């Protein structure tokens, strides 16, 4: 029997850019000002485009941001909050379908991620909401450490937990490394991850999947 589900947030429960691009303006300007020739204009444009769909730290590492660019980005991104209510994907009502503990583990800037969860109105669905905060590097244990901590604290067996998310480079990878099954949500623009245990188009498929696993 599956004992708990661990969900991702962005591109799993809500589009990462549902808040729009405007709140990101000051952070992107700060990164551009701190560039000072580190990246060519084309390379910088490519990096900025990646920011819309990937975690900032991953983008900074991939594109070779300078220390000044990283510091500018962290400083300004850390100030962003969701400007208003969010709706998420149209299947969030299925979060009511589960009678097992649900956990939410999301990577990003703490203020922004916590404001997204509040704006979606989904806090009460989860036993715990944990932010893998990019802007708190000294305390950061990343998603792998957070998920392992959930298993250890609650005494869950690894074969009775499922991680639900979209990113093959983040939660899907972590699940594989920890020996946990994963369900990849194939939201618009998400490519199937070969290493995900299962794939679904929307959360409405999860209850039947869990029922089939309980019958095994």
PLM features: what roles do these ranges have?
Residues 1-41:
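Active-site neighborhood of HAD-like aspartate-dependent phosphohydrolases
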Residues 30-33, 44-80:
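A metal-dependent, Asp-based hydrolase signature
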Residues 43-48, 60, 92-100, 192-193:
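Alpha-helix C-terminal capping segments
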Residues 30-38, 65, 121-125, 155-156:
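Short helix-capping segments at alpha-helix termini
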Residues 21-29, 52-57, 110, 114:
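An amphipathic alpha-helix signature
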Residues 1-3, 96, 103, 109, ...:
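Asp-based, Mg2+/Mn2+-dependent phosphohydrolase catalytic module
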Residues 14, 43, 104-105, 163:
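Short catalytic-loop micro-motif centered on adjacent basic/acidic residues
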Residues 78-104, 144:
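Short, acidic loop-to-helix structural element flanking the phosphoryl-transfer center
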């Amino acid at each position: 029997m599956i004992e708990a589900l661990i969900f991702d947030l962005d591109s799993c429960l809500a589009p990462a850019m549902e808040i729009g691009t405007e709140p990101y303006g000051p952070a992107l300007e700060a990164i551009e000002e701190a560039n000072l020739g580190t990246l060519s204009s084309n390379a910088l444009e490519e990096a900025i485009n990646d920011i819309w769909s990937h975690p900032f730290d991953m983008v900074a590492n991939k594109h070779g941001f300078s220390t000044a660019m990283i510091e500018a980005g962290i400083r300004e991104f850390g100030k962003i909050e969701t400007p208003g209510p969010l709706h998420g994907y149209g299947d969030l009502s299925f979060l009511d379908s589960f009678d097992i503990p649900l956990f939410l583990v999301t990577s990003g800037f703490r203020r922004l991620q916590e404001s997204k969860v509040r704006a979606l109105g989904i806090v009460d669905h989860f036993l715990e909401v944990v932010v893998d905060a990019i802007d708190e590097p000294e305390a950061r244990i990343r998603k792998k450490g957070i998920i392992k901590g959930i298993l250890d604290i609650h005494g869950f067996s690894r074969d009775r937990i499922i991680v639900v998310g979209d990113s093959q480079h983040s939660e899907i990878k972590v699940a594989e490394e920890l020996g946990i099954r994963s369900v990849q949500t194939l939201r618009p623009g998400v490519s199937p991850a070969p290493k995900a245990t299962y794939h679904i188009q929307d959360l409405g498929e999860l209850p039947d999947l869990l029922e089939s696993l309980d019958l095994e």
